[in-house]
Curated annotation (Swiss-Prot):
S-adenosyl-L-methionine as UniProt keyword: yes
One Pfam family in the UniProt entry: MTS
Subunit structure: Monomer.
A GO CC annotation given for this chain: cytoplasm
E.C. designation(s): 2.1.1.172
The gene coding this protein: rsmC
Protein name (Swiss-Prot/TrEMBL): Ribosomal RNA small subunit methyltransferase C
Subcellular location: Cytoplasm
């Protein structure tokens, strides 16, 4: 089943018939594969590891699939398709990336849902593109078309990162935040509560949903001897975390994981401010799976230390899988759950 933006792209497939096409920030469907019904060759870059895993089995000679914040080479394309991102600031980065990989006078297509801010693209397109025009609209989505008219500047990550100092209960740390990664330029309430009641940890510790690396940096500030692994589903977050670690002279293994699936072996501790906040059934199910999978990933005596919005239904899952619910701290918005594996 194709998403609405993907359906809008397919019904305009004559725009890139017989061409070499790059797709940026594609969604959780098989659109890159279906583009081959019209395009000569397709390369797709996903910033979401779950979306990348959905497409991965379909890779072939004319369908190259990548995960990350950049492509591994400097290949240029006839057409670049951008799915307009939820984070508006990320759109500017994707436009720069598209410009770098377009042939001279190459074609740019930008698609997105009306409610997702797609109309902002008209003002966001940089000078090296022609003014975009609305090509089509359907299923509450819009498709804009533009053309590369000047050479785009090369991507320099330092232009897309914000560095700032953050005070934590463990001391001051430097945070490096790439566009599209959650940041308040201060310690958010949930993470502050989590770090204010941080148990002493040991051995191998997993930071799940690491984001820009705030929790890991604070943890290593207090206990530099820990062997921390940082996982996230978002490519920009993973790169941000790597930059944060380098800025603080810390070392940790940072890699993508869809849930805990890509982690290996058992951990002495799992720590997280899980990225499940909206209370929708889909994210609630993911949260429940996180609790269940955590039990399977912890050694005997392992510590599970997370913070969550108090309205989210964690307690039942924790009771089911950990056999008890231990709330070590709470306020009017958040609860810190701190459990141990006893058997």
């Amino acid at each position: 089943m194709l998403t609405n933006p993907s359906q809008l792209i397919l019904r305009n497939s004559d725009l890139f018939a017989g061409q070499n096409v790059l797709v940026l920030n594609y969604e959780g469907d098989l659109l890159p594969k279906q583009l081959l019904e019209s395009a000569k060759k397709v390369t797709a870059l996903s910033l979401d590891y779950h979306h990348h895993l959905i497409m991965s089995p379909y890779a072939e000679q004319n369908l190259a699939l990548h995960f990350g914040h950049m492509l591994p080479d400097e290949e240029q394309f006839d057409t670049v398709i951008i799915y307009y991102p939820k984070a508006k600031a990320l759109a500017s980065y994707l436009l720069n990336l598209a410009g770098v990989h377009l042939k001279p006078n190459g074609q740019l297509l930008v698609v997105g849902e009306n409610k997702g801010g797609i109309r902002s693209i008209v003002k966001q397109v940089p000078d090296y593109f022609d003014s975009p025009f609305k090509q089509d609209s359907a299923r509450h989505c819009l498709l804009y078309v533009s053309q590369l008219v000047e050479k785009a500047p090369q991507i320099n990550l330092s232009d897309w990162v914000r560095n700032y100092q953050l005070e934590t209960p463990q001391g001051e740390i430097t945070i490096c935040n790439l566009v599209g990664v959650f940041s308040e330029k201060r310690l958010d309430e949930g993470t502050k509560l989590l770090l204010s009641h941080l148990p002493k940890m040991s051995g191998r510790v997993l930071d799940f949903g690491c984001g820009a690396g705030v929790i890991t940096a604070a943890l290593l500030k207090a206990q530099p001897e820990l062997k921390v692994e940082c996982v996230d589903i978002n490519a920009m977050a993973i790169e941000s975390c790597k930059l944060t670690l380098a800025a603080n002279n810390f070392t940790a293994d940072t890699y993508p994981s869809d849930g805990l699936t890509q982690t290996k072996g058992l951990f002495n501790g799992i720590i997280s401010n899980p990225p499940f906040h909206d209370g929708l059934r889909s994210t609630t199910d993911i949260a429940k799976n996180f609790v269940k999978d955590s039990v399977q990933k912890l050694k005997k005596g392992g510590v599970w230390h997370i913070v969550a919005n108090r309205h989210l239904p964690y307690s039942d899952s924790i009771s089911t899988h950990f056999k008890q619910v231990n709330v070590s701290a709470e306020n009017n918005r958040y609860k810190v759950y701190s459990n141990k594996i006893n058997s």
